[in-house]
Amino acid sequence: SFYGCELWNLWDSAVEVFCKAWRQGQRAVWNLPYNTHCRYLSLLCNGIPIHDEICRRFLSFVHKSALRECHPVQFIVKYGLLYGRMFSQCGRNVLYCADRYGFNLNDIFNRHFSANIVTQKCQELGNVEDVAAVNMLFELICTRDDVFTLDGFSKCDINSIIDNICSA
């Protein structure tokens, strides 16, 4: 779906354009209103926001590359991170992620480093109210799509409730 994203420049505005298109696609797949909160989409899909997923994949790629047995690959990554920094796309992206997720640049070279730091940070930022709203939203979507049944409510009523939750 986003093959090669590990090599993207995370500072580029095109990444945000891609993420916006991805969220629009999620809204279309779930048949949700255009003004559905972005924070609900990743919870509804049981994942993390698309931008964070791209960062997670990048960090995993760089971490594995930095610890590779292949010395030319290891050298290029270490040079980009330790000396190139902002002049290197790899260095720029790691600094961006380090600032965003609160880790030290040198942590990448630690064998125990995990790109799941991104997932953990996203889960920390989540709140109980959003989870409850998304659980209700999921049940309403299933009811609207005739997976569940709910007596006493018309499709129009269910769609109104979905619209209200999505934009509240």
Question: Can you say where each PLM-predicted feature lies in the sequence?
Answer:
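General structural signal for alpha-helix termini and helix-helix connectors
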Residues: 5-9, 31
